[in-house]
Amino acid sequence: MSFPKGFLWGGATAANQCEGAWNVDGRGPALTDVKTGGSVNAPRLVTYIDKDGNPHAEPESPRGIPEGAHYAVLDDYLYPNHDGIDFYHHYKEDIALMGEMGFKTFRMSISWSRLFPNGDEEVPNQKGIEFYRNVFTELREYNIEPLVTIWHFDTPLYLEEHYGGWKNRKLIEFYTRFAQTCFEEFKGLVKYWLTFNEINNTVMFLEMFGNKASDEDYQNAYQILHHQFVASAKAVQIGHEIDSENKIGCMICGITFYPMTCDPSDILLNRHTWERGIFYCGDVQCKGKYPTYANRLWKEHNVELEILPEDLEDLKKGTVDMYSFSYYMSTVVTTHTVTDIVSGNFSAGARNEYLQYSDWGWATDPTGLQYYLEMMYDRYEIPLLVVENGLGAFDTVEEDGSIHDPFRIDYYRQHIQAMDKAIQNGVDLIAYTTWGCIDLVSAGTGEMRKRYGFIYVDKQDDGTGDYSRSRKDSFYWYKKVIASNGEDLD
């Protein structure tokens, strides 16, 4: 194996999926707090009250909720993010388990509304500051390097309702204040930062709607992305000014796309899919300017961006230090008519007969990870981090309390071997954090039974459970992997 000395092995979570304590110690509600539970066959619902006072629960839409309506938590619905896995009260126990595994890093996010309950305040909530300072201090006690995502899908609800969310340029100001507060308050405790989680999902989400997405939807999506690009660039500049030791990266939802056939139209579609879905966000954040093909993407949907002259200067000055991404699966694109369509992780495509699929329809493709790593390093030539990778699966607790998950071990083994091949081919890969190292609420379906962790959490989809933690077989396996720096994968 060729993993470099000092390689950052660890795991990843997100505040809205694990913390719980959604209305504790001054935290305000976030967009994720009005999403119900769901399943692979039933979408999560967003709940709201319309202008006439009538309650509604509908699948999430890129258009948000109707004009005059307001988000609401309704009776008779289960909101799994409200409690998460109660990391807020279990963080010491959880970090001790990470320390036992030998984690070198732990990727987590900071809940914007825990620091700024509405999002537009000028002074942060000190209870929130204290919580995160305690978490980072605890991680340091175990020599675990925090890797912190500043925004992970959880915009404060107040900003959505009163400003229209990221469609409003004012959110650049509010976000940069939030980011600056994080950089200042946690200086010396955190040096690895990611500005926006899976920033490209704004457009990927629209692709899932196909022809149902209008030009107006694309106009809003690309304007949202522009505001987030500028906010990210400003945050990078602020973070470097506050602490020259800070390393700040982007975070992309990574999917490897393949053409279904060698039909030239499939080859061209595949290239354009990479540009629209993956390269667009990476190019702006890593190269500091919009790529030439951006004009084609905008023209496809009659998009006319509002870009200020100073925005372009900020993009140039605020390029990221490193490129991080999630990787779970690959997908197949084609111009031909196909009937066997599989979807997952903000993408849909033809079934790949050469791959196996999970119970949630996600293709297992470690070679796709190697392909992605080599392509991105060749394109950007900055350090890469795989900050999400994992297999959502059913776990069974045996009578003696043991949890055998050889399928999860095999999944990770294959993907670690793929990373090793990429490193041998010259890729500068510095970190690997498995997704959901401890079981948590699924962002896509709101389920607990879709489990990723090395650590089992006794919480079920109906909200029952005592939140106790248990080690799975994969816990001991990953501990061995880390101790050997990737040498021992048996």
Task: Give the role of each language-model region.
Residues 76-90, 167-170:
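Active-site mouth loops of central-metabolism enzymes
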Residues 1-75, 100, 118-120, 129-490:
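Active-site region of glycoside hydrolase catalytic domains
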Residues 110-124:
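Glycine-rich, proline-tolerant flexible connector loops at the mouths of alpha/beta enzymes
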Residues 90-111, 317-323:
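Catalytic domains of carbohydrate-active enzymes, especially glycoside hydrolases
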Residues 84-99, 117, 128:
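Internal amphipathic alpha-helical repeat/solenoid segments
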